[in-house]
Amino acid sequence: EVGEEITQTIADWEGRIIVAAVASNLSRIQQVFDAAADTGRRVVLTGFDVENIVRTAIRLKKLSLANESLLIKPKEMSRFEDHELIILETGRMGEPINGLRKMSIGRHRYVEIKDGDLVYIVTTPSIAKEAVMARVENMIYQAGGVVKLITQSLRVSGHGNARDLQLMIN
């Protein structure tokens, strides 16, 4: 299951983790929150969009936190060791690729990718952005980070397969 893989990946990494997700995928965000609670890490929300989405989802009981101290503000990161942090990057309009690019070249508002960081991509980039994603992955490696993609068998594209399309046509 996806949640188990996320928790295991986070538990196994000794340094700082940057999780790239789509802001509107609340089930994936919940899995990150659960993994953080299970592994004793705090979650930093780096974007205005994701912060608003998360706060609203918590208020509407669509997301839950194991405890209120699970979420910290970006300015509080310096109070924690790298192994205590998960940085949740969703980028503007819920797309994390540009935020990761900025992190890899030191232009992000709060985070710069450094040696020992794991960039864990738990979303499937749209087909139109695959080339951009490949370039960003290279930039992350050049900055000293390590990239891990969620297991292919666990990813969901949001698009129908050939059988689904055939069913719709007939």
Predicted regions located by residue number:
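Acidic/His-rich, metal-assisted hydrolase cores and their charged scaffolds
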Residues: 1-170
